[in-house]
Amino acid sequence: MKTMMGIIFANIYDKNMGELTYLRTMASVPYGGRYRQVDFPLSNMSNSGIRHIGIVTKEKYQSLMNHIGSGQEWDVDLEEGGLQYLNPFAMGHDNGGSDGRYRGKLDALKCAMSFLELSKEDYVVLVDGSVLCAMDYREVLKSHVESGADVTVVVKDGICDGQREVDMAVRLDEMGKVADIACNYAAPQGFYASAGAFIISRELLMEKVQEAVARDRYHLERDLVMHGYHKDLKINAYPFAGVALYNESELE
């Protein structure tokens, strides 16, 4: 049986949200009164049987920690596995900058290398805290394994319109295979937008993170997925059919 662990990136798009994230991370922005945005990826992981989760933080994460606590509400406060906060200072990383904080998702994962090395799961689910949806990662893993791909990207149609820039746009051929990938692109209709969720084997992730950061490449979408697609990685796309809310700007 293939096993999964999860990593949530908590600070995605903080700078785009104005005063909403002045004192908190994007993941801890309130939703529906008592809830926070991080509840969505945490619940998705818990409901998918994932009990080993790391939350990557960058700054202003006290309210996030206060809300999540030990993770008991999501059944991840277990002695084996459980939940771990991966902040840049606790990870002991010095990137030569003014404050030692990571420069991109791959840099953050390089900081968290010991977390990955000490884990036992076969696959890692990497998720942004900015896309709100109900998703079963077991179905994504099934698609990933059956495809024989190195990386699976969860994608959503109806987002790309030629005007709105997305982190990653994916074009599929008539067989549903990935035909093109572009990053930071206002892709036209017909492209799928990344839903901020990826599956990759733990061993391959560690290998590719080390390779990328050693070459000053720090961005997951651009430097691992897109660069890998154009070089040597097989990329699979999993079209998500459910409803998803993309929280990327205070103007939306």
Can you describe what each PLM-predicted range is?
Residues Q37-P41, D107-A112, L224:
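Well-ordered alpha-helical segments embedded in enzymatic catalytic cores
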